[in-house]
């Protein structure tokens, strides 16, 4: 694994992708578990044969990708479906993310994991954890605008995730993303310099 791994997480609508992109602009590597999940469930993705075998051909679209609407209905209708889905996807995501962290040539890697706080496996991989934070009212507003969901739908998703307090308690560092872009950039730039220093210290200590 790359010498220094920074786990990045935050609640839905917190702006994780925006912050991850800012770190990449500064020179960090990025391993995004959501992107890996999409890759695995795209047409020809490594998870598709197992998903079709487990859930039937209806979970695939005509081009062979996972039909997210169909899978979402199955998961809501049958509590065991989520466990079975995660049993197929999660080992593959863990394997690929570990391989990509190891292969990264950057001074440090941002490992973006939406449910990092809920997952002991990913937390153990990280040298630091940075949480993207904003008021819960702003999370709801952003997701409603982005995804066309109702406030109740967004609140239901938030209720299934770690609480804001739990995420902040797990954080080594916090990036506040409350719509002030200049402040956001300044926070990421300062953390980037800190992570470069910590990465160099770790390399030196391991020599």
Swiss-Prot record:
Positions of transmembrane segments: none
UniProt-listed CDD domains: DPCK
GO biological process, one term: coenzyme A biosynthetic process
EC number per UniProt: 2.7.1.24
GO molecular function ontology, one term from the record: dephospho-CoA kinase activity
Keywords: ATP-binding, Coenzyme A biosynthesis, Cytoplasm, Kinase, Nucleotide-binding, Transferase
Binding site for ATP: 13-18
Example of a GO cellular component annotation carried by this entry: cytoplasm
EC supergroup of this enzyme: transferase
The reaction(s) this protein catalyses: 3'-dephospho-CoA + ATP = ADP + CoA + H(+)
InterPro entries xrefs: Depp_CoAkinase, P-loop_NTPase
Pathway given in the UniProt record: Cofactor biosynthesis; coenzyme A biosynthesis; CoA from (R)-pantothenate: step 5/5
Domain DPCK: 5-202
Locations listed in the record: Cytoplasm
Family to which this protein belongs: Belongs to the CoaE family.
Function of the molecule: Catalyzes the phosphorylation of the 3'-hydroxyl group of dephosphocoenzyme A to form coenzyme A.
Name under which the protein is recorded: Dephospho-CoA kinase
Species the sequence originates in: Dechloromonas aromatica (strain RCB)
Gene coding for it: coaE
């Amino acid at each position: 694994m790359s010498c220094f791994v920074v786990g990045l997480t935050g609640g839905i609508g917190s702006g994780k992708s925006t912050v991850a992109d800012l770190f990449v602009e500064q020179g960090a590597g990025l391993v995004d578990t959501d992107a890996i999940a999409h890759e695995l469930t795209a047409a020809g993705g490594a998870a598709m044969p197992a998903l079709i075998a487990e859930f039937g051909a209806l979970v695939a679209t005509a081009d062979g990708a996972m039909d997210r609407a169909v899978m979402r209905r199955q998961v809501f209708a049958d509590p065991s479906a989520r466990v079975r889905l995660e049993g197929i996807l999660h080992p593959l995501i863990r394997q690929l993310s570990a391989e990509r962290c190891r292969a990264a040539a950057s001074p440090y890697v941002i490992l973006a994991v939406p449910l990092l706080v809920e997952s002991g496996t990913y937390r153990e991989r990280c040298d630091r954890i940075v949480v993207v934070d904003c008021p819960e009212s702003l999370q709801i507003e952003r997701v409603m605008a982005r995804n066309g969901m109702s406030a109740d739908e967004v609140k239901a998703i938030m209720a299934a995730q770690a609480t804001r307090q739990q995420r902040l308690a797990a954080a080594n560092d916090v990036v506040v993303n409350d719509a002030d872009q200049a402040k956001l950039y300044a926070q990421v730039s300062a953390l980037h310099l800190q992570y470069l220093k910590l990465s160099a210290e770790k390399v030196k200590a391991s020599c």
